[in-house]
From Swiss-Prot:
The keyword Protein biosynthesis does not apply. The gene is CSM3. Pfam families: Swi3. Component of the fork protection complex (FPC) consisting of TOF1 and CSM3. The keyword Transmembrane does not apply. Forms a fork protection complex (FPC) with TOF1 and which is required for chromosome segregation during meiosis and DNA damage repair. FPC coordinates leading and lagging strand synthesis and moves with the replication fork. FPC stabilizes replication forks in a configuration that is recognized by replication checkpoint sensors. GO terms for biological process: DNA repair; DNA replication checkpoint signaling; establishment of mitotic sister chromatid cohesion; maintenance of DNA repeat elements; meiotic chromosome segregation; replication fork arrest; replication fork processing. GO terms for molecular function: DNA binding. It is found in: Nucleus. Residues 1-28, 132-169, 213-240 are annotated as: Disordered. InterPro entries: Csm3, TIPIN/Csm3/Swi3. This is Chromosome segregation in meiosis protein 3. Belongs to the CSM3 family.
């Protein structure tokens, strides 16, 4: 049995009409050439993404409709329904992070980003009716609170101001809501007050008014539920 060498293979290929492999025709790879790779775009959760069409505007538009509390479900079922809506929204907006991390990022951005804080105050003004008139409440100096015994010392006023400055918007909202409720009980505000009369309030008073409105809405909901339960009990008594 005879072995065929490389020279004989090349000669046989030439006789069959083929051409031997030319080293010059082979593509040579330059080791010094720089290979440019396309980098993936890193998606970050920032103020621009939160105020985009799929961000907070989508949440404000669809949350009252899709995250509605139903009387047919129990408390646990309603909580799961609301939580599922927010989880789907968070995954659609920023799928890279888990829901718990997404909430932490939103909380941090809400306390540090100035544009996001301004957007939030704009929403509060729109809900209170100040933005409809195109009014922007100007900053006011500190007002001395007088009680039955006379004027309050200046040191205590400065201490209260420093305490409120250290609080975030969320903390200030719940801190000032009780004081606003007590003041509204002592000195009720007339219903004929127009949005133009509210133009001189600061951010703390805006947050307090918003908290008072939310508390009144919750009380109305509870009263309506109690009335419906009483009506059902009366119907049951009639049948019995």
């Amino acid at each position: 049995m005879s072995s065929v060498g490389p020279l004989e293979d090349e000669a046989a290929g030439t006789e069959l009409g083929g051409s031997p492999a030319d080293p010059a025709t082979l593509t040579e790879i330059d080791p010094s050439a720089i290979q440019v790779r396309k980098t993936r775009t890193v998606v970050k959760l920032d103020c621009e993404r939160l105020v985009s069409k799929k961000g907070l505007p989508y949440l404000l538009k669809n949350a009252p409709k899709h995250a509605r509390i139903s009387k047919r479900r129990d408390t646990y079922g309603n909580l799961c329904h609301v939580l599922q809506f927010y989880q789907l929204w968070a995954h659609e907006l920023y799928p890279k992070a888990k829901f718990k991390d997404f909430v932490a990022l939103c909380d941090r951005l809400g306390k540090t980003d100035r544009q996001l804080r301004a957007y939030r105050m704009q929403l509060i003004r729109e809900e209170l009716g100040l933005a409809a008139e195109g009014l922007d409440p100007p900053p006011q100096p500190l007002r001395e609170h007088t009680g039955a015994g006379g004027s309050q010392p200046a040191g205590s006023v400065a201490q209260d101001t420093n305490t409120n400055a250290d609080l975030s918007d969320d903390d200030l909202l719940y801190t000032t809501s009780r004081a606003a409720a007590a003041s509204s009980t002592a000195n009720p505000v007339p219903r004929s007050e127009t949005p133009a009369a509210l133009a001189g309030v600061d951010e703390a008073e805006l947050l307090a008014q918003l908290a008072e409105m939310q508390r009144a809405a919750e009380e109305d909901v509870h009263e309506s539920e109690d009335d419906e339960q009483l009506a059902l009990m009366r119907e049951m008594d009639e049948f019995m």
